[in-house]
């Protein structure tokens, strides 16, 4: 059997009811379709980050935040690629603060990774929130990618301080 509705044929399948998000409904006690998420629930694709966007949060991340990703080639390759996309224009391919925007004097004072004490946790925190003239990259890269970039930045730093 076939039901015709708007020139569409649905054979032997359930035809779902399309609810409007804010429509009235007797399915819930408050009478509306859209419900407030259960306390403690986490949105899909979002990961909690317990360090605040403060100097104290930065220092805490610097000393206590540890990378959960493995030190394997796949992470290194992806970290290097992401660094080239998001970081090298300011920080340079070597991490010396001499990226294309710096050499063209679009920004001044981009730090070299050898200039200060950084850790994977502090790098992750800066990617999450931004710092000084650098904006947050949390919207561009997910948590795993931030850790991969942090891993690559630490490799660059180690080469610079040798």
Spans of features found by a protein language model:
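Soluble non-cytosolic domains of exported or imported proteins
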Residues: 73, 77, 117, 140-144
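Electrostatic cytochrome c docking/interface patches
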Residues: 35-82, 158
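C-terminal capping alpha-helices of c-type cytochrome domains
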Residues: 121, 125-133, 138-162
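Post-signal peptide N-terminal segment of mature Sec-exported envelope proteins
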Residues: 11-30
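Gly/Gly-Pro-rich "capping" loops immediately C-terminal to redox-active cysteine motifs
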Residues: 76, 80-81, 92, 96-125
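The canonical Cys-X-X-Cys-His
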Residues: 79-94, 149-153
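Single conserved hydrophobic/aromatic residue that forms the stacking wall/gate
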Residues: 1-10
């Amino acid at each position: 059997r076939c039901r015709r509705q708007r020139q569409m044929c649905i054979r032997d399948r359930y035809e779902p009811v399309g609810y409007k998000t804010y429509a009235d409904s007797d399915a819930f006690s408050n009478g509306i379709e859209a419900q407030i998420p259960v306390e403690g629930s986490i949105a899909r694709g979002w990961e909690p980050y317990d360090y605040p966007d403060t100097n104290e949060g930065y220092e805490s991340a610097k000393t206590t935040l540890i990378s959960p990703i493995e030190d394997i080639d796949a992470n290194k390759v992806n970290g290097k690629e992401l660094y080239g996309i998001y970081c090298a224009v300011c920080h340079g391919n070597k991490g010396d603060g001499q990226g294309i925007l710096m050499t063209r004097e679009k920004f001044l004072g981009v730090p070299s990774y050898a200039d200060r004490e950084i850790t994977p946790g502090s790098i992750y925190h800066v990617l999450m929130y931004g710092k000084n003239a650098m904006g947050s990259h949390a919207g561009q890269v997910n948590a795993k990618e931030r850790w991969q970039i942090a891993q690559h930045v630490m490799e660059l730093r180690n080469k610079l301080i040798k």
